[in-house]
Swiss-Prot record:
Protein name: Keratin-associated protein 19-3
Family: Belongs to the KRTAP type 19 family.
Subunit-structure text: Interacts with hair keratins.
Gene that specifies this protein: Krtap19-3
Residues annotated as transmembrane: none
Length: 87
């Protein structure tokens, strides 16, 4: 789970199923920038972040929970929508 469609609802490219750098990261870490895990921002934030591939409550491309864009984690259940969702 380190490329397209990371472990949990990442944007899809790069690596970082759990807090690693790159896009599509989704974990519970508190990083900032590319591949943020929890509450970060930028590409692939994990929880409450914003930008590409946020994991939970984020907004932008690939938000996971309650977000919008492509690569949402739950495209209909949690108010997110898009494509390339994993969970």
């Amino acid at each position: 789970m380190s490329h397209y469609s990371s472990y949990y609802g990442g944007l899809g490219y790069g690596y970082g199923s759990f807090g690693g750098p790159g896009c599509g990261c989704n974990s519970i870490r508190r990083l900032v920038g590319f591949g943020s895990g929890y509450g970060g921002f930028g590409y692939g934030s994990g929880f409450g972040g914003f930008g590409y591939g946020s994991g939970y409550g984020g907004y932008g491309y690939g938000s996971g929970f309650r977000g919008y864009g492509c690569g949402c984690r739950r495209p209909s259940c949690c108010g997110g929508y898009g494509f390339s969702s994993f969970y």
